[in-house]
Swiss-Prot record:
GO annotation, cellular component aspect: cytoplasm
Gene Ontology terms describing biological process: base-excision repair, AP site formation via deaminated base removal
Active site: residue positions: D64 (proton acceptor)
Subcellular location: Cytoplasm
The species this protein was found in: Clostridioides difficile (strain 630) (Peptoclostridium difficile)
EC number, UniProt record: 3.2.2.27
EC supergroup of this enzyme: hydrolase
GO terms of molecular function: uracil DNA N-glycosylase activity
Function as written in the Swiss-Prot or TrEMBL entry: Excises uracil residues from the DNA which can arise as a result of misincorporation of dUMP residues by DNA polymerase or due to deamination of cytosine.
Name this protein carries in UniProt: Uracil-DNA glycosylase
Keywords noted in UniProt: Cytoplasm, DNA damage, DNA repair, Hydrolase
Amino acid sequence: MVNLGNDWDELLKEEFEKDYYLNLRKFLIEEYKTRQIFPNMHNIYEALKHTSYKDTKVLILGQDPYHGDNQAHGLAFSVQPQVKTPPSLLNMYKELKDDLGCFIPNNGYLMPWADQGVLLLNTALTVRAHEANSHKNKGWEIFTDRVISILSEREDPVIFVLWGSNARKKVELIDTSKHYILEAPHPSPLSASKGFFGCKHFSKINEILKKLGKEPINWQIENI
């Protein structure tokens, strides 16, 4: 049984008992037994474990985990310490530098964001090594859609950050009368120059948080 150790346990209890999830679980048990799967089995739910429902101020939506060795650890866009910063995250750092003057750190470990209430959620939480989107349409999207919907049902406003066409489709799950939506092209090198650079989302998030009377996010990731 999944134990997230915070308020998500109660909110997702019914989800973990649904047929689609039980089928997904069976599939994953077999996959982890017979193939190399990322992230490590114990890190699948890292995003939800580190950023509780109550503490979520911002949701940044990713797609599926990094599929290279030693990269993924359960937070969207983040990599383990001592691993080279991937291109999309490097572009996020470049935007942060232009937007807020942050220096570009020597690592891509985003746990400090998660600990401040930034839920770094991928739409699929697992992937086969070196095979992008290999766990697409296995059930994860139903599960992560439910996470988005649960946050949308909350009275306390959440800032939903949707980068790229896949993430932007999720806007239909969100009550836009209560919550804030920031949309832009994906920070990937393929699309960053089409409107991600210059979107100023990081400063916009902090402006909204201040307006809501909440502590802004310290976006600076320190060197390790």
